[in-house]
Structures are given as C-alpha cells and as structure tokens.
C-alpha cells in the first residue's frame, strides 16, 4: 500500500513539522507514505476573482503533474463529504481491497483547490466545516491515517 500526500506550499512552523514527522514514523510499519510539496503562488491582498482563479490554476497544474496514474485520488475540500474516523478507516480499507495499490490525498493552498482537481478526484473529503490552515491539514490527515491503520478502527 502506498499513500501519497500532495500539498501546496512548505511548512515553516517547527511544531507542525515535528508532528508530521511523528506520524510519518508511526505510519511507516503499515504503509509506504510520502509527502510531495508543490510551490505555492504568492497571493497579494485584495485579489480579483480572475487573479484568484489564475493562482488556483497554476497550483492545480503543479498538483496534477504529481498525481500518479492509477492512484485513487482524494481531494480535501471544505465542501466535500464528511465522515467520522471509523468510516474513514473503512474507506481506506475498501479502497485498497478494491484493487487500488496507491491513494493520493491532495491538500490545496491558502486559497483552496482548483475546481478541475476536485472534479477529477474520486472523492472530495471534508474533515470539518471549520476552516483549518492548509499546513495544519497535513498533520490532521496523518493523524487520521494513523488511527485508521493502527487497529483501533478495525483496518
């Protein structure tokens, strides 16, 4: 089983990096996992809708170039489907049992995700209706993946 996380931007906060490294280490016995970062576009204040769409497109094209063919793609989006931790673990299990060998989770930048990526994804998933910093979403995703794999949620 391989899990790819494609995320926009670099993480500068040590506490988030420490948490990410903690969960990556805990996940390695269960699956092969990697995080790929794509460059985040600089977004000036007071963007027009056209400027916002252009930034999302550029980031989106970078993301698309990193997605491996044949991977089950899950985009993290606030308007996506909400599920609890148990259902998330069952979803991971069912996806791999259905023949997929790789899953790719996509985390957008500060402006969100390009619509084309959401349309091309197998699933748009929301962890909450609340807004979280995109850097923190990596840590939250890794923690949920660990819960799914460690046996407490029957994976």
Swiss-Prot record:
The EC code for this enzyme is 2.1.1.177
Q: Which GO terms describe its cellular component?
A: cytoplasm
Main location, first listed in the record: cytoplasm
Its protein name is Ribosomal RNA large subunit methyltransferase H 2
Q: List the disulfide bonds.
A: none
Could you list the residue ranges that cross the membrane? Answer: none
Its job? Specifically methylates the pseudouridine at position 1915 (m3Psi1915) in 23S rRNA.
Assembly and partners? Homodimer.
Gene symbol here is rlmH2
Q: Where is this protein found?
A: Cytoplasm
Entry annotated with the keyword Cell membrane: no
Matches recorded under SUPFAM superfamilies: alpha/beta knot (SSF75217)
The family database entries (InterPro entries) matched by this protein are listed as:
Alpha/beta_knot_MTases (IPR029028), RlmH-like (IPR003742), tRNA_m1G_MTases_N (IPR029026)
For this protein, the record's CDD domains field holds: RlmH-like (cd18081)
Q: Which residues bind S-adenosyl-L-methionine?
A: 76, 108, 127-132
Gene Ontology MF, one: rRNA (pseudouridine-N3-)-methyltransferase activity
